[in-house]
Amino acid sequence: MLRNWMIKRFKQPEINEIKVKHEAIIKHLLNMIPGCKVKHKHNFDTGSVAFYMGISGITKELTISDQYLQDYTAIEIFDFIKQKEVIKIISTHGKVRISMREGYPAINYR
C-alpha cells in the first residue's frame, strides 16, 4: 500500500510541469500585450487556471482547462493562441476560455 508521502512524490514531476507551463503562459501574455499585468489562479472546482490581465485599469480573463494544459506542450498552446487570435478576442470580450471538446481544443468567449 502506498503511503501519502509516496503518492505526493510520484505526482511531483507532473505538478512541476504544469507550474512551468503557467509561468511560460504568463511570460507569453506579457510579451503579447505590452504594459499589462498578469496574475493567475487555479480553480479546482472547474479544473482550470484563470489568467487575469490588467490592461489600462480593465481586467480581462483567459481561462485554460487543466486537461488542455496537460495534453499540449507550451509551444503548442502558444501556437493555438496565435492561430485563433485569442489576444484580439480578449480585447473585445471580457472572458475567454480554452477547453477540450470532443478531443479537440475549443474557444468560448463572452
Where are the regions that the model predicts?
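Polar/charged, Gly/Pro-rich intrinsically disordered segments
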Residues: 58, 95-110
